Design a protein with these regions (language model features):
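Short coil/turn segments at secondary-structure boundaries
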Residues: 1-6, 14-20, 34-38, 191-212, ...
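ATPase catalytic-site recognition across NTP-hydrolyzing enzymes
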Residues: 1-57
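A residue-level signal for conserved active-site and pocket-lining positions in enzyme catalytic cores
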Residues: 3, 179, 258
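Gly/Thr-rich phosphate-binding beta-strand-loop-beta motif of the actin/hexokinase/Hsp70
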Residues: 48-73
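Acidic active-site catalytic centers that drive phospho-/nucleotidyl reactions
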Residues: 58, 110, 254-257
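Extracellular low-complexity, Gly/Ser/Thr-rich intrinsically disordered linkers
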Residues: 72, 228-267
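Mg2+-dependent endonuclease catalytic cores in nucleic-acid-processing enzymes, primarily RNase H-like
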Residues: 73-238, 275-280
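Enriched but not universal
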Residues: 245, 269-280
Length: 280
C-alpha cells in the first residue's frame, strides 16, 4: 500500500491539504471495503456503523478565545459546537450535559491553563452524585505531553521511517500528524475507488478504522474545514515537528482542536490506554 512519506513537505507548510479534508465529507457513504466473503462493498449502512463514541473539549483560554467540542461515532465526526464562556465550570457542565446521554463516553479535554479546572468540576459532580463514571469519563489531554509509543515508527512496519520520539516534538504534533494520516488515507482510497469505477484500476484499500469521515450535515462544517486546513508545521529547535495552529492573521482553530483530541485519545485516569492511529 502507498503511504504518505513526504515528511519534509508536510512539516514545512499546511499540515492537512484542504482537498483531503473536503474529500472526507460524507466519506462513510463511499469508503470501499470488503466483507467477510471478500466482496466489494461501497459505503456503510447505519446498521454497519459501530455504536462507539468519543469526544473532545477545547477550553477557552484567554481574550476572545471560544470553547469548542466535537463528537464522533466510530470514524465519523457527528457534530461540533462552539460557544463563548469564561467560566470553566460552566463549560464543563455544558459539555457533560451534552455528552452524558451516551453512556460510558470518554471526553478528552484540554487540561492546560484554564482547562485544568474542568476536572475539579467533574469531581464535584461525581462526589455530589449528580453524575457517575458509568455515564461519562473526563480524560485530561495535555498537548505538551511526550509522544505516545515513542519507539514506534511513524509509518508502522516501515523501518526507514523515523521513530515517533525523533519526529514529533510533543503529543500535539503527533496528534495532528495522526489525523493528517487519516485524511490522506481517506482521500487516497476514494481516489482509487473513482479510478476503479472509471476503468477498473485496482482499489487501494485501507482498514476503515484508520480513516475519517465528516458528517456533511454538521452546521459548522465550512468553518471546521477551514480550521483543519489552517495549522502549519515545521522543525522546532530540536528539529522535531512542531505545530503552529495560528499562522499570521488567523484565529485559534478551536473546533479543529476538539476534533483532533477526539480522534487521538490520551492515556486516561481509569487504567486504560487508548492510542490513536499514527498511520497504521
Amino acid at each position: 500500500q502507498e503511504v504518505d512519506r513526504d515528511y519534509s513537505a508536510a512539516i514545512s507548510n499546511t499540515i492537512i491539504p484542504r482537498a483531503w479534508i473536503e474529500a472526507a465529507v460524507n466519506a462513510h457513504f463511499r469508503i470501499p471495503w470488503k466483507d467477510k466473503n471478500g466482496e466489494l462493498c461501497i459505503g456503510f449502512r447505519p446498521d454497519q456503523i459501530p455504536n462507539i463514541h468519543g469526544a473532545g473539549l477545547d477550553v477557552a483560554d484567554e481574550g476572545i478565545d471560544r470553547n469548542a467540542s466535537a463528537l464522533k461515532q466510530w470514524i465519523i465526526l457527528r457534530g461540533v459546537d462552539e460557544w463563548g464562556e469564561r467560566d470553566p465550570g460552566v463549560t464543563a457542565r455544558r459539555a457533560m450535559a451534552n455528552f452524558r446521554q451516551i453512556k460510558g463516553i470518554k471526553v478528552q479535554y484540554d487540561c492546560i491553563g484554564i482547562g485544568s479546572n474542568v476536572k475539579s468540576e467533574f469531581n464535584r459532580l461525581i462526589e455530589s452524585g449528580d453524575i457517575t463514571i458509568d455515564e461519562i469519563m473526563m480524560i485530561p489531554w495535555n498537548a505538551g505531553d511526550a509522544v505516545q509509543e515513542p519507539f514506534a515508527h511513524i509509518v508502522p512496519d516501515d523501518e526507514e521511517s523515523l521513530l515517533n520520539k525523533d519526529f514529533f516534538q510533543n503529543m500535539k504534533a503527533q496528534a495532528w500528524w495522526s489525523i493528517r494520516t487519516r485524511f490522506f488515507k481517506t482521500w487516497k482510497t476514494l481516489q482509487s475507488l473513482d479510478a476503479y469505477l472509471k476503468d477498473g484500476t485496482p482499489i487501494e484499500f485501507y482498514d476503515p478504522e484508520e480513516l475519517i469521515s465528516l458528517d456533511g450535515s454538521i452546521p459548522l462544517i465550512k468553518q471546521l474545514i477551514k480550521e483543519l486546513a489552517q495549522p502549519t508545521g515545521g522543525p522546532g529547535a530540536s528539529l522535531r515537528m512542531v505545530v503552529n495552529k495560528k499562522p499570521k492573521d488567523t484565529k485559534s482553530p478551536n473546533l479543529a482542536d476538539a476534533v483532533v483530541m477526539a480522534y487521538f485519545p490520551a492515556i486516561d485516569d481509569y487504567g486504560n490506554v487508548s492510542v490513536g492511529s499514527y498511520g497504521a
